[in-house]
A protein has these predicted regions:
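Glycine-rich phosphate-binding loops of nucleotide-dependent enzymes
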Residues: 2-248
Length: 248
């Protein structure tokens, strides 16, 4: 039995000064899926991500999440509902320790509901942080200042920060950008592990990553959906090969 549709866009679009950056995208995401969104530069991938995350307000269309249309809902409210986006450029507090970075995110999640209650539950917050550190493989570096981490570990930390918000859907923008091959392999393993309890959407240019971890792939071109399918289907799609894949 197929998993339930957890997120769906209907005729989603946004214009910038008359330019259609995203143009009528219909997108259906199933619970527990790893979905890759690919396409050439300027295809609208990051803009589409920003629409899903609430960073941009669509010009047209709908975004349905758990039975509610969230199109145009501000980013902080969408995050609270369970859709969290990481960034293409690492976004951490460099002067804080690894532990403090994640704890800050976890505390903000708690204080959205009960500011003073957070202090009574500080032990639970710390337990949550330690659990996340173990999940992302940074337990032994919890006291290290974030600025002193390797680039790859900084990206893992950013994923940890997003996990502290208790996401249902995790949007990862170029999660392996700038990583060494070894770091990329570890990140692929981490994403696959996280997908056992989360639904994950990634924008990624490294096709070895896309082929290696995706359950399903959406290809955007000129802001519109060019093709969707499993990795083998996309590999063998003539339109995709012509527009994007080339020699991949």
């Amino acid at each position: 039995m197929a998993a339930e549709i957890i997120l769906e866009t209907k005729d989603l679009g946004i214009n910038f000064s008359g330019l259609k950056a995203v143009d009528g995208v219909n997108f259906r995401l199933r619970e527990g899926e790893i979905r890759s969104v690919i396409g050439p530069n300027g295809a609208g991938k990051t803009t589409f991500f920003n629409l899903l995350a609430g960073n941009l307000r669509p010009t047209k269309g709908e975004i349905w999440f758990r039975g509610k249309n969230i199109a145009g809902v501000p980013q902080h409210k969408i995050c609270r509902k369970g859709i969290t986006k990481s960034h293409q450029i690492t976004s951490i507090f460099p002067g804080l320790s690894v532990f403090e970075n994640i704890r800050l995110s976890a505390q903000m999640r708690v204080t959205q509901y009960n500011f003073w209650g957070e202090y009574r539950r500080i032990d639970k917050v710390n337990e949550k942080v330690m659990s996340i550190l173990e999940e992302i493989g940074l337990t032994d570096k919890k006291n290290r200042v974030a600025a002193n981490l390797t680039y790859g570990d900084q990206r893992y930390l950013e994923i940890g920060i997003t996990l502290a918000t208790d996401p249902v859907i995790l949007l990862l923008d170029e999660p392996t950008a700038g990583m060494t091959p070894a770091e990329t392999r570890e990140t692929m393993k981490l994403i696959q592990k996280l997908a056992k309890k989360l639904t994950i959407v990634i924008v990624e240019h490294d096709m070895s990553v896309v082929w290696g971890i995706s359950h399903y792939i959406t290809v955007l071109h000129n802001g519109a959906t060019l093709a969707e399918g499993t990795p083998p289907e996309i590999k063998n799609n003539d339109d995709v090969r012509r527009v994007y894949l080339g020699g991949h």
